[in-house]
Amino acid sequence: GYKPNRDCLEQLLSDADVIVTGYRPNSLDRFGLSPVELHNRYPGLVIGRVSAWGLSGPWAERRGFDSIVQAASGIAHIHADGTGRPGALPAQALDHSAGYLLAAGIMSALRRRHLDGHGWTVDISLARVAQELLAQPLSVPTEASPYKIQTVNARTPGGTVTCAAPAINISGGPDSYRWIGRPWGTDQPEWAEPQSASVQR
C-alpha cells in the first residue's frame, strides 16, 4: 500500500502552497521529503518546520516537546513552587508562541514568493522560543482583571464539545470552526474546498 499512498501525497503536494511539519530535523529525508528535495519537485512550496531543539547542536536529533524544553531550558526551575517541585508556563506557552512565530514566518515567505516566485523554508524551534522568552526582562506580576472566555459548542460523533471561540474576530468572517472532533481516519486525502463565511456559520 506504500506506492498508492505516496502517489496521493505527491498529488496533494503538487497543489499545496504550504506544508507544515513538526518532526526532528532530517527525520523525513529518508522519504525524499527534505526541503531540498521538496523544492526540487515543487519550486514554489513554502515549508514550515517546528522542532524541539533546532537544526544544529548536540540535541538537534533528539525528540522533544513543550514540557521537556521548559525543563531543559530552566523554565521549570524558575517557576518551581516553594517545595522545589518544578513548575511550568501556562497553556504550553512554547508550543503556542512557536506556532504564532511559524505562522508569521509562513505569511512572510508567501509574500516573498509572490514577489520572486521561489519557495522558502521557515524553521522555528521550541528551544529558541524558550531562550527568547528567558531573555526578556522580568516583570512583577499584576492581578489580571476578570475575563470571560468566549466559547462555541459543536456536536460531534463523540458528543458535544465546548471550546474557545476563534481568537480573531473579523467582521463577516467565521465565528466558529469548520471541523471539530472529527473521528481519526474519516477524512479523504484531498484539499477542502473554501467556504463562504455565511456557510461556515
Q: What residue spans do the PLM features occupy?
A:
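Active-site-adjacent "lid/gating" segments in soluble enzymes
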Residues: 37-182, 186-187, 193-201
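A structured beta-alpha segment of the ubiquitous adenosine-cofactor-binding alpha/beta core
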Residues: 1-40
